Amino acid sequence: MIQQLNIHKLRNLEQVELTLARCNLIIGANGSGKTSLLEAVFLLSRGKSFRHHEPRRYIRHHESDCTIWAKTFGDPSNTLAIQKKLDTQGKSDTLLRFNGQTAASQSVLSFQLPTLLIDPVGMSLLDEGSGTRRQLLDWLVFHMKHEFYQQWLQYQRLLKQRNSLLKQPSIQHRLNELLAWDGQLSYYAHALHEHRQEIFLAWATHFQQMLGLLLPEYQHRLSLQYVAGFDTKNPLIDTLKSRIDQDIELGYTRIGAHRADVSVLFKSTNDQGQKIREQATHILSRGEKKLLITALKLSQLQLICNAISHSNSDATFPVVLIDDIDAELDDAAMQILLRTDRKSVV
């Protein structure tokens, strides 16, 4: 966990140096930079802000760069740093360092500093597109299945190449080339699905347990559902072949692991006595949805902390970032959080 945090030229934080405990409560007036402190940790961990993706939006006004540096508990040489820079045209560049050496990619820092964010914006998770929910699952898989990330990168590279080829005017004369890409894309799609499915099943179990604590009246009516994005019973390459004309017409790949989704279903009975399932977001009140999303995230935290505690790995416990704690967590959720992981930044 973070022992020392230095922030330079991030929003209204010109120069901040903090020594942190394992659990921290940040207080201050509105606009004093409380959320920016959380943003700094998230930026260091994920390489992007949870408020704005464009560096020019969070680099201090009239400055060309911002830097976040952190030292963790344990080995005094264990340090992480990220610098976001703007050139004269406003284009951004990123410099990463781990233990004083240049880091090859953001994944190096992400693995060393996992972060779980609970904030007001995240409470719209159920109403957003599938991408946000897929990222929620993939964050968990990334930290529990370390081979997942390289396979995910390969899939994204192949998908980009396939989509580019689909847009070419000469595509009808390059179908054999497309078939070669499809074979590799299919292989990695099924590999990603296997990892996601395994971790999802464990997550779903912890989610049901968390519902019993936060939304006991709905524990047996709500269920977590994972959709792979393609028919996993058959090779993806066969499905891609059968839909090649539609993909060429659209200019992109409509099915695959990139279309995976996670949703929460609400079980009920209609007037004819038939059992039906609907999206929970259409049924629950705003307050109930907030508790539901809290259950999703705390069940993730519980799962990953339990896995680390029962393993011999050097994996790091997640840092939990909570923006506006009174608004986002009720007393029950706060007690669960403190019991689950006492090594978090809050």
What residues fall within each predicted segment?
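Conserved NTPase motor "head" modules and their coupling/switch loops across ABC/AAA+ ATPases, GTPases
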Residues: 1-29, 43, 172-320, 328, ...
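Walker A/P-loop
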Residues: 35
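Nucleotide-state sensing region of NTPase/ATPase domains
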Residues: 46-132, 138-148, 241-245
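Residue-level signal for inorganic ion chemistry
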Residues: 58, 211, 346
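Structural recognition of the conserved hydrophobic beta-strand(s) that form the central parallel beta-sheet
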Residues: 70, 342-346
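Extended, highly charged alpha-helical segments
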Residues: 123-190, 194
